[in-house]
């Protein structure tokens, strides 16, 4: 159950996205120096080179219809800019939830109040993602370029905890905070109540093109530290590296076990751009990754499924056999693939090697050779696994809280555990016992202590 399983490297693996990150607006109440969207106060329209405005409420409804038809129950992150600045944000959330999407709100947390948190809970938002980049207000506010941002975000997180809405804390690592990463993780969990701590590795895009201040060797050191933090918080808080698919190399290199799968089915692991993930810009432009300023089409001109299935950009970015530089011969390319947005931002070639990676191909071949096929194979997105055991109603209901793209695999894994342990009927108690043995906690999908 604890294994994370990558999809097979076949056309079926790319049938639908698991996650859609949708930038609803360029407007923002902060002016973060690393913003990939170059968002900020008073930005209503796109930059001067475009005559397209942000999508209207009705246009957003049509986009939601397309997402729901193409990728039922997919995780849909409504972000910005600051999405809570849109006057119609609750209407957009309500419509998305009604269509069966797993709606998550990506926000800086500054605008969260008790009233708003309760409204978001009423609208059945699955969770929120908040940004926090330092333990002290001065450094965070300097990075976010608005005085008082830290205090408001921290208070917003505490409000969410009181209301009972789960949330993620997002931190972008840099010279300003790399010395306090372990303390930031502890603060996110112990002081704020976060279910997840995501550490982002900067991608040179938007304003972020100008603020990278860590060398590849320093990033390697951070990844090593992050592996230790991940082990420290196992079973209490999920700890992830974001925009760092080569984290797999760090984990495979370690002699001591980390909460990462030492088995796989091969295929599209690592960077999910264009394989499991896509981004939508405020004007409807579609990209394989929000950090990648290359666009495969616009939803005003073509349907989402058509863009996903037929665009040259999506087709190209999936072809890991066509990667360049050190990524081409790398034994980890099916597990990693490098960050395509970083490759483009630093070289101008979306298929180039990831300049942040220091790995020399071939040096981990022996570790890769020891990997075995996963015990629980992939199940096509959204398809239920055929139940071999009887499930109690409460256990069935809980499974519906698990995202559709892994529900079939989790069902198989649960039944496999039950069969090995002589359990004939899947009960809520059995699920609790299984969950207690997992290296990472449950995150979204429940609002009570069960």
Feature names for model-found ranges:
Residues 1, 23, 46-50, 55, ...:
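Radical SAM enzyme [4Fe-4S]-AdoMet core and its adjacent flexible, acidic
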Residues 27, 31, 35-38, 274, ...:
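Cys/His-rich metal-chelating microdomains
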Residues 3-16, 291-383:
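Flexible mid-to-C-terminal extensions adjoining Fe-S/redox cofactors in radical SAM and related proteins
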Residues 63, 92, 96, 156, ...:
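Aromatic/hydrophobic pocket-lining residues that form π-stacking "cages" and hydrophobic walls in ligand
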Residues 381-450:
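Non-catalytic accessory segments flanking P-loop/AAA+ NTPase cores
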């Amino acid at each position: 159950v604890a294994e994370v399983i990558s999809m097979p490297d076949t056309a079926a693996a790319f049938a639908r996205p698991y996650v859609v990150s949708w930038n609803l607006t360029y407007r923002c109440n902060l002016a973060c120096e690393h913003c990939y969207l170059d968002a900020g106060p008073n930005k209503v329209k796109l930059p001067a080179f475009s005559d397209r405005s942000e999508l209207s409420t009705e246009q957003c409804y049509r986009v939601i219809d397309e997402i729901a038809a193409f990728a039922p129950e997919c995780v849909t992150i409504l972000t910005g800019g600051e999405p809570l600045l849109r006057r119609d944000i609750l209407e957009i959330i309500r419509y998305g939830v009604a269509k069966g999407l797993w709606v998550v709100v990506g926000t800086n947390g500054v605008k969260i109040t008790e009233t708003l948190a309760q409204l978001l809970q009423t609208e059945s938002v699955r969770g929120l993602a908040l940004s926090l980049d330092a333990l002290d207000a001065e450094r965070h506010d300097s990075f976010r370029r608005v005085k008082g941002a830290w205090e408001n975000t921290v208070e917003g997180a505490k409000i969410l905890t009181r209301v009972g809405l789960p949330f993620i804390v997002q931190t972008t690592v840099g010279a300003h905070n790399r010395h306090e990463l372990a303390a930031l993780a502890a603060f996110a969990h112990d002081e704020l109540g976060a279910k997840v701590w995501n550490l982002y590795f900067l991608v040179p895009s938007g304003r972020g093109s100008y603020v990278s201040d860590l060398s590849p060797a320093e990033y390697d050191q951070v990844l090593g530290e992050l592996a230790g933090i991940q082990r420290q918080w196992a079973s209490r808080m999920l700890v992830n590296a974001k925009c760092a698919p080569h984290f797999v190399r760090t984990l495979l290199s370690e002699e001591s076990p980390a909460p990462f799968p030492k088995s796989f089915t091969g295929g599209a692991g690592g960077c999910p751009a264009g394989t499991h993930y896509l981004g939508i810009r405020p004007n409807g432009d579609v990209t394989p990754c929000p950090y990648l300023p290359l666009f495969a089409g616009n939803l005003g001109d073509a349907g989402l499924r058509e863009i996903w299935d037929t665009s040259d950009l999506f087709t190209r970015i999936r072809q890991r056999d066509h990667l360049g530089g050190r990524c081409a011969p790398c034994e980890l390319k099916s597990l990693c693939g490098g960050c395509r947005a970083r490759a483009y931002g630093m070289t101008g070639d979306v298929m180039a090697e990831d300049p942040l990676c220091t790995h020399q191909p071939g040096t981990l071949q022996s570790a890769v050779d020891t990997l075995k096929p996963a015990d629980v194979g992939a199940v096509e997105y959204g398809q239920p696994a055929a139940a071999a055991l009887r499930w109690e109603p409460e256990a069935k209901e809980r499974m519906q809280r698990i995202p559709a793209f892994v529900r079939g695999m989790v069902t198989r894994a649960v039944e496999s555990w039950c069969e090995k342990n002589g359990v004939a009927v899947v009960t809520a108690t059995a699920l609790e016992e299984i969950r207690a043995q997992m290296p990472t906690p449950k995150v979204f999908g429940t609002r009570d202590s069960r």
